[in-house]
């Protein structure tokens, strides 16, 4: 059994990266591997946008990640710098920066690149999507 971290750099919609990452994560867990963390970076931070509203006939990828994190206790880390550049903030950042409101999906955590560096050093595999 290996421990994994996924690095997601693609947005929730518009490319296949994030949906492929979620399917890979589900397959890892089904095979008995341990998925410790998913780190969302660059455009991947858009997977944590609470205001995303897909069409009724589309899979809700943001809530799919949230469910994966909740059910399997996977840390959903979002790069704080990349998130703020793309208009995603939690309540603490929104207050600190005098933003209108927060829109980080529950279950996701704003974190720094140090969290990703720690994952690279700690887990058996880091896979980028």
Curated annotation (Swiss-Prot):
User: Coiled coil located at which positions?
Assistant: none
GO CC terms: sulfurtransferase complex
Q: What is its EC number?
A: 2.8.1.-
Keyword flag tRNA processing: yes
Which residues does the Swiss-Prot or TrEMBL record annotate as the active site? 79 (cysteine persulfide intermediate)
UniProt keywords (A-Z) are: Cytoplasm, Transferase, tRNA processing
Provide the top EC class.
Answer: transferase
Swiss-Prot/TrEMBL GO biological process terms: tRNA wobble position uridine thiolation
Keyword Cytoplasm found: yes
MF annotations from Gene Ontology: sulfur carrier activity; sulfurtransferase activity
Entry's localization field: Cytoplasm
Domain of life assignment: Bacteria
Member of which family?
Belongs to the DsrE/TusD family.
Q: What does this protein do?
A: Part of a sulfur-relay system required for 2-thiolation of 5-methylaminomethyl-2-thiouridine (mnm(5)s(2)U) at tRNA wobble positions. Accepts sulfur from TusA and transfers it in turn to TusE.
Listed under subunit, the entry gives: Heterohexamer, formed by a dimer of trimers. The hexameric TusBCD complex contains 2 copies each of TusB, TusC and TusD. The TusBCD complex interacts with TusE.
What is the protein named? Sulfurtransferase TusD
Protein source organism? Pectobacterium atrosepticum (strain SCRI 1043 / ATCC BAA-672) (Erwinia carotovora subsp. atroseptica)
């Amino acid at each position: 059994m290996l421990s994994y971290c996924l690095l997601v750099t693609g947005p929730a919609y518009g490319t296949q990266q994030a949906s492929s990452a979620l399917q890979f994560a589900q397959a890892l867990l089904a095979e008995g591997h341990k998925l410790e963390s998913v780190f969302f970076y660059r455009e991947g931070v858009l997977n944590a946008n609470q205001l995303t509203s897909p069409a009724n006939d589309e899979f809700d990828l943001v809530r799919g990640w949230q469910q994966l994190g909740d059910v399997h206790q996977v840390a959903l880390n979002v790069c704080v710098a990349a998130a703020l550049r793309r208009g995603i903030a939690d309540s603490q950042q929104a207050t600190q920066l005098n933003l209108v409101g927060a829109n980080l999906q529950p279950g996701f955590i704003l974190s720094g690149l140090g969290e990703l560096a720690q994952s690279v050093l700690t887990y058996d595999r880091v896979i980028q999507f």
